[in-house]
């Protein structure tokens, strides 16, 4: 038998029983899910093994079950076989027991990104043949996406029932170096039970730190029409860390964005600027914010009574405090730079405020402030070095800057295009569309003799490369001239 069909060891079975009892005490429905996986045969032995496992779980106290057919290939993706299995389980197990909730299924086509939209697609087959009581998961237009009437209309018209929305937030399995503490938004507030039968939030691996987002999702589901993301977030901060709320808020407001994929707003109360656009009032306000950032970790450590939450946040808080320090120093350094009276003093302080390789490795492992704070530091240091070297030498230094139509091309991720390290790379985090572009700003008009683009992986299944692309150049950033014909599937 596959391992998934075997009984749990005694200790694990006891843990599940304990968890189920805790759920009952707290009015939470415990749902046990199984993923049949690649080894499914669709034969009678398979079916009886599954029923036996369901009965074992029933005896442990499980009264709600789900089957997942996501992220597999081969025979297991057959929607006709899936519906036959689900319908038979509903008849033989769910209805015969009498006290078991309706089944839930995650289809192979759980996102519009790759779902077959035709009447022959698996979703349409679900709609025509799947027992009406069975609830069907849906992640939206892409894997991580907002809950909108449009995406529900699209899927509901095919599965012929209100979808069960699987919201991939605040999960960070695609950005494990980030911990999401921002407001819960992107959930439409005009929906009702005719549009969806439920919503499930996929949390981070950090259980305690996920509670801020789960507090928002719970609030949304309790009263959809009245839900307000910011009001909920402000209340959640106080609920989770009442004795250090303001310091926690400082950390949370700068720990919202993913940098890639499912982008979230961050640092919306903070205004940053380039050194060339210096404004003393804005500089003082930004220094005060960096000062709060620098002090927040110690204040949180002092006031946080949830040891589990503190343990999860600590690696990020350590780097957050360092970000506050280097941000303050960058602003202080900018005053010396703008004064222009002591080159030696400026350069000594500049060198001391550079991030070492170890500093960067530590920050990359536990990032925050990615949308505004760290980019301010990076841009300020780059701008001052560029201006200083130009003034000293009288020549324009070589300076490459990543640009593009993708939103995160404006973040420090774009620097990874030109760091001379083949183990690091820039990724947009989203699929390319017609008209998307990525490029390099050379800083000034220069002769270019070679363009080298390293992309893709050593895999036949890889799709991370430009497709139907053209290499172009521009002198003014407005008029573009092709350098090549269209390039198709060239990994290079």
Residue ranges and their predicted role:
Residues 1-101:
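Substrate-binding cleft of carbohydrate-active enzyme catalytic domains
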Residues 390-448, 454-468, 477, 485-491:
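Disordered, acidic Ser/Thr/Pro-rich linker "stalks" and the adjacent N-terminal cap
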């Amino acid at each position: 038998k596959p391992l998934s069909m075997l009984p749990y060891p005694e200790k694990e079975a006891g843990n599940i029983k304990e968890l189920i009892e805790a759920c009952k005490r707290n009015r939470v429905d415990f749902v046990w899910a199984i993923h049949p996986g690649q080894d499914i045969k669709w034969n009678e032995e398979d079916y009886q093994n599954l029923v036996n496992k369901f009965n074992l779980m029933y005896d442990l106290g499980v009264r709600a079950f789900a089957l997942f057919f996501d992220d597999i290939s081969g025979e297991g993706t057959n929607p006709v076989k899936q519906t036959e299995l689900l319908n038979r389980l509903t008849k033989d197990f769910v209805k015969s027991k009498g006290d078991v909730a309706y089944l839930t299924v995650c289809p192979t086509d759980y996102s519009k990104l790759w779902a077959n939209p035709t009447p022959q697609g698996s979703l349409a087959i679900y709609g025509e043949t799947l027992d009406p009581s069975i609830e069907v998961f849906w992640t939206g237009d892409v894997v991580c996406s907002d809950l909108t009437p449009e995406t529900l209309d699209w899927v509901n018209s095919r599965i012929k029932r209100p979808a069960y929305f699987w919201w991939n937030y605040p999960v960070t399995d695609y950005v494990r170096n980030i911990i999401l503490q921002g407001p819960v938004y992107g959930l439409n507030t005009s929906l009702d039970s005719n549009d969806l039968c439920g919503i499930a939030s996929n949390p981070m691996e950090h259980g305690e730190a996920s509670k801020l987002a789960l507090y928002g999702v719970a609030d949304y589901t309790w009263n959809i029409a009245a839900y307000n993301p910011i009001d909920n977030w402000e209340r959640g901060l106080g609920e989770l860390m009442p004795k250090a709320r303001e310091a926690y808020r400082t950390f949370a407001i700068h720990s919202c964005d993913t940098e890639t994929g499912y982008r979230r707003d961050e640092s919306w109360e903070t205004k940053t600027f380039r050194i060339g656009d210096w404004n003393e009032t804005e500089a003082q306000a930004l220094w005060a914010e960096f000062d709060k950032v620098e002090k927040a970790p110690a204040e949180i450590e002092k006031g946080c009574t949830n040891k589990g939450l503190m343990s999860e946040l600590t690696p990020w808080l350590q780097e957050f405090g360092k970000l506050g320090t280097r941000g303050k120093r960058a602003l202080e350094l900018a005053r010396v730079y703008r004064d222009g009276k002591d080159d030696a003093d400026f350069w000594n302080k500049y060198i001391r405020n550079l991030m070492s390789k170890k500093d960067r490795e530590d920050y990359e492992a536990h990032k925050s402030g990615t949308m505004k704070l760290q980019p301010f530091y990076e841009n300020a240091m780059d701008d001052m070095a560029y201006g200083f070297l130009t003034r000293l030498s009288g020549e324009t230094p070589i300076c490459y800057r990543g640009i593009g139509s993708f939103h995160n091309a404006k973040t420090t991720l774009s620097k990874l295009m030109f760091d001379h390290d083949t183990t690091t790379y820039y990724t947009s985090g989203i699929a390319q569309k017609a008209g998307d572009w990525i490029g390099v700003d050379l800083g000034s008009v220069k002769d270019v003799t070679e363009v080298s683009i390293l992309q893709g992986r050593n895999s036949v299944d890889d799709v991370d490369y430009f497709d139907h692309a053209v290499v172009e150049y521009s002198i003014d950033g407005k008029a573009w001239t092709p350098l090549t014909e269209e390039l198709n599937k060239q990994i290079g």
